[in-house]
Curated annotation (Swiss-Prot):
Xref: SUPFAM superfamilies: DNA helicase RuvA subunit, C-terminal domain, Nucleic acid-binding proteins, RuvA domain 2-like
Keywords: Cytoplasm, DNA damage, DNA recombination, DNA repair, DNA-binding
GO biological process: DNA recombination; DNA repair
Source organism of the structure: Nitratidesulfovibrio vulgaris (strain ATCC 29579 / DSM 644 / CCUG 34227 / NCIMB 8303 / VKM B-1760 / Hildenborough)
Quaternary structure (record): Homotetramer. Forms an RuvA(8)-RuvB(12)-Holliday junction (HJ) complex. HJ DNA is sandwiched between 2 RuvA tetramers; dsDNA enters through RuvA and exits via RuvB. An RuvB hexamer assembles on each DNA strand where it exits the tetramer. Each RuvB hexamer is contacted by two RuvA subunits (via domain III) on 2 adjacent RuvB subunits; this complex drives branch migration. In the full resolvosome a probable DNA-RuvA(4)-RuvB(12)-RuvC(2) complex forms which resolves the HJ.
Region (Domain III): 155-202
InterPro entries: DNA_helicase_Holl-junc_RuvA_I, NA-bd_OB-fold, RuvA, RuvA_2-like, RuvA_C, RuvA_C_sf
NCBIfam families: ruvA
UniProt keyword Nucleotidyltransferase, yes or no: no
Disulfide pattern: none
Stated name of the protein: Holliday junction branch migration complex subunit RuvA
Lineage, uppermost ranks: Bacteria, Pseudomonadati, Thermodesulfobacteriota, Desulfovibrionia, Desulfovibrionales
Length: 202
């Protein structure tokens, strides 16, 4: 399963972009609207945490700037009647912390601002979110690309490496070395540095 993609931005079309890795492989990645608006010019470097959606006729990659956003997308698409396109539309309108606040504040109608979601569907989604979203993380659900407490950086980067197939012992050892040398790294930076170190060691 593809969980992380990093490379050069080759093309943007609609709500998707094409990322060409350093190995020359190009991936079409669908991203939320706010991420689309912040993409660099063609040729710039981009990186995404990936959720892979497999259908009978297609394999689609959905990319997110933070691990929290990716995990929220997975929660959303686990809800009946919420497909990948709807999940992406919701995350184009609301960040993960916004969704948690909606749950805490019991603001069902806010979801109807998302195109294609009526009141009945919003109520259904909201009911599921109450049980599936980690509202106890509010207000400090730190995004992977903006840093946070060192322990949180280590924990989230370790989870990212585990999802890429690395063993906990190996990944933990490399991450500790990385963060010892560069303690101010955010999660995205720590993950990239660890991946480079792991690649050199193999």
């Amino acid at each position: 399963m593809i969980a992380y993609v990093e490379g050069r931005l080759a093309e943007v079309a609609g709500n998707a972009c094409v990322v060409v890795t350093d190995g020359g492989v190009g991936y079409e990645v669908f991203v939320p609207g706010h991420t689309l608006a912040r993409l660099p010019d063609k040729g710039g470097r981009v990186s995404f945490f990936i959720s892979t959606e497999v259908r009978e006729d297609a394999l689609e990659l959905y990319g997110f700037a933070t691990w929290d956003e990716r995990q929220t997308f997975i929660v959303l698409t686990s809800i009946s009647k919420v497909g990948a396109k709807t999940g992406l539309a919701i995350l184009s309108q609301f960040r993960p912390d916004d969704l948690r606040r909606l749950v805490v504040e019991d603001d069902v109608l806010a979801l109807t601002r998302v195109s294609g979601i009526g009141k009945k569907t919003a109520q259904h989604i909201f009911l599921e979110l109450k049980y599936k979203l980690k509202v106890e993380d509010l207000p400090a659900a730190a995004p992977l690309v903006t840093g946070g407490a060192p322990g949180g950086v280590f924990r989230d980067a370790l989870a990212g490496l585990a999802n890429l197939g690395y063993g906990e012992e190996e990944a933990s050892h490399v991450l500790k070395d990385v963060l010892h040398g560069e303690p101010d790294l955010d999660v995205g930076g720590a993950l990239r540095a660890a991946l480079r170190a792991l690649a050199r060691g193999r």
